[in-house]
């Protein structure tokens, strides 16, 4: 009877999801409620976790709860610490969920809500969550090694060194981009800075509480942490309103850069149980709580999707970003569907904290589904805004114009209704002087969230509050990826340096830790600082590579997963990784080729550089440059980006080729050839999941 009722529940979930998808598909140009997207997404996630992740766990990788994990085996109180699965879920989710799921879907909305929705859902089920889960499994079975070191073990020394260099370079770009977004969000924002700063002492208290004061009392410390977090958010508004207090928490971009660099260094060196894990767990309360609250708000308000299902910009002529739907939609959405950055966390901090191998499914697959839900919420928030306002916020000023009248005229010509009064009223409602050309996706997400939440709590008078709350939410959301990413980067760099000097590979060595951390922080910190002081320098030079390099890293991780399955003699299930690997290789290599060699200056770095050079030769200055000197800087940036794109293509192709060779060898072998650490049974005591 219980089994029958269980099947009936899942049949009901499937039918509800099918009905939601049918409602979306049969809209025929009519506006529909955003709640159907939310319902469809939740049904997909529930079914995928219950059935597909269970299939992978039991058949493909065959998780073993009696096998000792690296956290239990090497429990050193620093990097290897058996951690309660709910705390670890919070840490892992906070670490992987950065800017991508917030910003990518917002930018993808220029093509309509349908393409983005379909890729976010299909991508996470069959690619993103699969990658995170399988890489976590592989690393856990190999003493928690980093991605590059895993490639070196399973594919060979040459591809391993290539992967180590390539992955670390991509990691530096990703961390610098994420850090720049945090700096921009917190500059001259005492409310946001105070609240983010307050999470540090709260996390330290939580770490000490669960390790020494009340070990294992996760429920207690969760309640305490949540109350303190809410108090810090509420008091942050008082800090903002007080001239005396605001002065203590108001920093320039340069000051915040140095603070962030210092924090990243400290967070990477301190024991993981003391700051990083509890702070990420704490941040997850706000992250998941806000997203769930937004979902409930959508169910209550049932706002209309004002963006069309498909816009005319699917042809690649969009003003927000250039490029055809294939392959650039998949590159733009990035982390909401699949992210290479996640593989660095799944092979970095998380496998060193996993208390039982069976929890890899909940943490690896489950946390990625949660991040995808964040992406769906971001897409919905962007699509409930009037399309005219959306394009006015996200298109560059050089295309739009600078006055409300000019912007309204330009956007109206694109086929979207917009008046100057709509722009001024929206800016006034959210407490901004202007919303024109607020590119990057984050302000648009904040406006969309405010439009939904103010209808649930507070009315029009609370519009500005919810807007600024959303900006704070985004900053805290992204910062957790910076500190965890720095620690993962330290592990990667130690593996890389250990290739040449084995002593530097020892994670328990303080000198090795300090050296690798200093080098990692210096790498992303340099690009961050230069990007803050120079709008055309530092990470601003490499920003266009963020999406494509991230997806290329995912392709490398999935190649590794495919090779390991063949070497484990699980080739009958290898389609689980082969399909997403092939798709990502096709997408990323096509996008990389077009970014280098396409003839369209709006797409190709080289074509854009040639266009600017021709204009400069005639003495003309083209936007966004304001002088011939700036034109030369942009031309230089284009050549740097083209060279790095070509380098990343070579890295991905070489890893793919070595992967094919490894698969052929594995098929010829009679016995499994994967290089797992020898099996050791889990100790009988102490009890697992103690929360330490």
Q: What is each stretch, according to the model?
A:
Residues 18-31, 100-102, 114, 172-188, ...:
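Transmembrane helix-loop junctions in multi-pass membrane proteins
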Residues 53-81, 107, 117, 121, ...:
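Flexible loop linkers connecting adjacent transmembrane helices
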Residues 1-15, 47-101, 284, 324, ...:
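Membrane-interface "cap" regions at the ends of multi-pass membrane proteins
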Residues 154-172, 364-373, 439-441, 459-470, ...:
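Loop-to-transmembrane helix boundary motifs in multi-pass membrane proteins
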Residues 22-28, 33, 79-142, 153-157, ...:
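Membrane-interface helix-loop-helix modules in multi-pass membrane proteins
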Residues 35-43, 47, 53-60, 166, ...:
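Membrane-interface loop-to-helix entry segments
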Residues 31-50, 108-138, 148, 191-203, ...:
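Extracellular loop-to-transmembrane helix junctions
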Residues 298-314, 369-448, 484, 529-534:
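Extracellular/periplasmic helix-exit of transmembrane alpha-helices
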């Amino acid at each position: 009877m219980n089994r029958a009722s269980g099947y009936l529940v899942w049949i009901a979930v499937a039918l509800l999801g099918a009905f939601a998808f049918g409602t979306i598909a049969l809209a025929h140009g009519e506006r529909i409620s955003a709640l159907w997207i939310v319902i469809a997404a939740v049904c997909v996630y529930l079914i995928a976790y219950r059935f597909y992740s269970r299939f992978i766990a039991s058949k493909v990788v065959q998780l073993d709860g009696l096998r000792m994990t690296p956290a239990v085996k090497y429990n050193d109180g620093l990097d290897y610490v058996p951690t309660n699965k709910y705390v670890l879920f919070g840490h892992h989710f906070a670490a992987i969920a950065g800017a991508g799921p917030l910003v990518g879907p917002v930018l993808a909305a220029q093509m309509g809500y349908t393409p983005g929705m379909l890729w976010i859902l299909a991508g996470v089920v069959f690619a993103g969550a699969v990658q995170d889960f399988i890489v976590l499994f592989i690393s856990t079975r190999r003493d928690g090694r980093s991605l590059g070191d895993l490639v070196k073990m399973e594919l060979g020394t040459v591809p391993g060194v290539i992967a180590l260099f390539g992955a670390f370079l991509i990691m530096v770009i990703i961390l610098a981009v994420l850090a720049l977004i945090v700096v921009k969000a917190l500059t001259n924002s005492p409310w946001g800075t105070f609240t983010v700063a307050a999470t540090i002492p709260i996390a330290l208290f939580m770490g000490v509480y669960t390790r020494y004061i009340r070990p294992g009392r996760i429920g207690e410390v969760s309640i305490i942490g949540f109350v303190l977090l809410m108090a810090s958010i509420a008091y942050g508004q008082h800090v903002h309103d007080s001239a005396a207090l605001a002065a203590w928490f108001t920093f320039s971009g340069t000051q915040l850069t140095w603070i962030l660099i210092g924090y990243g260094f400290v967070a990477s060196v301190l024991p993981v149980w003391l700051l990083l894990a509890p702070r990420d767990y704490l941040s997850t309360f706000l992250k998941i709580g806000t997203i769930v609250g937004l979902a409930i708000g959508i169910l209550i308000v049932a706002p209309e999707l004002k963006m069309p299902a498909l816009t005319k910009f699917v042809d690649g002529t969009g003003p927000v970003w250039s490029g055809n739907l294939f392959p650039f939609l998949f590159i733009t959405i990035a982390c909401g569907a699949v992210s290479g950055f996640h593989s660095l966390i799944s092979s970095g901090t998380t496998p060193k904290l996993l208390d039982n191998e069976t929890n890899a499914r909940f943490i690896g697959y489950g946390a990625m589904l949660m991040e995808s839900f964040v992406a769906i919420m971001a897409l919905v928030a962007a699509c409930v805004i009037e399309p005219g306002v959306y394009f006015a916020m996200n298109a560059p000023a050089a295309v739009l114009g600078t006055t409300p009248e000019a912007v309204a005229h330009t956007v109206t010509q694109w086929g979207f209704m917009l008046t100057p009064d709509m722009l001024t009223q929206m800016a006034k409602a959210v407490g901004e002087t202007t919303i024109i050309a607020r590119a990057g996706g984050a302000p648009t997400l904040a406006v969309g969230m405010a439009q939904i939440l103010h209808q649930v709590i507070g009315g029009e008078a609370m519009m500005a509050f919810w807007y600024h709350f959303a900006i704070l939410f985004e900053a805290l959301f992204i910062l957790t990826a910076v500190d965890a990413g720095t620690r993962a980067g330290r592990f990667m760099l130690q593996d890389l340096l250990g290739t040449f000097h084995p002593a530097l590979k020892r994670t328990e060595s303080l000198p090795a830790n300090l050296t690798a951390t200093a080098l990692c922080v210096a790498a992303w910190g340099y690009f961050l600082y230069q990007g803050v002081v120079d709008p055309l320098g530092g990470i601003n030079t490499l920003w266009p590579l963020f999406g494509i390099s991230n997806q290329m890293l995912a392709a490398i991780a999935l190649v590794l997963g495919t090779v390991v399955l063949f070497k484990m003699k699980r080739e009958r299930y290898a389609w689980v990784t082969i399909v997403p690997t092939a798709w990502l290789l096709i997408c990323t290599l096509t996008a990389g080729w077009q970014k280098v060699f396409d003839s369209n200056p709006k797409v190709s770095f080289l074509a854009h550089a040639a266009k600017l050079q021709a204009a400069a030769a005639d003495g003309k200055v083209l936007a966004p440059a304001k002088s011939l000197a700036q034109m030369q800087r942009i031309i230089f940036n284009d050549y740097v980006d083209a060279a790095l794109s070509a380098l990343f293509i070579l890295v991905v192709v070489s890893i793919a080729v070595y992967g094919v060779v490894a698969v052929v060898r594995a098929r010829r072998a009679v016995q499994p050839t994967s290089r797992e650490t020898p099996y050791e049974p889990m100790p009988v005591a102490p009890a697992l999941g103690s929360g330490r």
